[in-house]
Amino acid sequence: PLRVKYPNQTIYISYREILEYTLSHSDNNTCDWLIDFVGGIKHVDSYIKSLGITYLNLTETEHSMHEDIMRSYNNWSTPLSVARLLQKIFTEHILTNEHFIFLEEAMLKCSSGKDKLIAGLPADIKFGHKTGHSDRTSDGIRICEADAGVIYLPNGEKCYIAVLIKDSRESDQNNVQIMADIAALVYHSLKKGLTD
């Protein structure tokens, strides 16, 4: 999205705007800029693991995965690890209050993935999330379709959810419908629990 807005130009933008493009608009270029800024992908991987999130591996950037799609397999996680990372961010004060508010607002303003998890939730339910997906291999396999976020329940509680679809031969429409269906089932179960 940033390259579309500023084609073939030298630009100067704030880190705040770079973060907004990365979080709210899923911009791969700004994601890689941020990775470089904090010391590289190995540093990001080490930091997340230092938080106690162990079932993940990050060795590739967006650029390296676009150069060779098979490198996408080097980056992996479990849905539980992604959801636990979100839970830690929201409950353990990993970020300063100012940075947490910024992150939460950026996730609530996410413009991508309107047909993913959020599509399975009632329109009046707040949902902050971050989406992603890989390219397809030459065999038509979508290595990853992802959405992870926070459902704000009517009673004030939060539900942390992550859905990662791996090696799918399904159409993009079917993949996102699976995600929406999962979100609907989770919300229905949570709502039932609130009324029992």
What spans do the regions from the language model cover?
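Active-site-proximal loop and beta-strand segments within enzyme catalytic domains
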Residues: 1-16
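Secretory-pathway/luminal and periplasmic proteins that interact with or process carbohydrate-rich
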Residues: 1-4, 28-31, 55-59, 112-117
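Structured, acidic catalytic/metal-binding patches in enzyme active sites
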Residues: 10, 25-26
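Mid-domain, small-residue-enriched loop/turn segments at the edges of structured enzyme/sensor domains
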Residues: 11, 19, 32-94
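Catalytic-loop motifs flanking and including active-site residues across diverse enzymes
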Residues: 18, 26, 30, 78-81, ...
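Structured C-terminal helix/loop/strand segments within mature extracytoplasmic catalytic/sensor domains
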Residues: 36-37, 41, 84-116, 120-125, ...
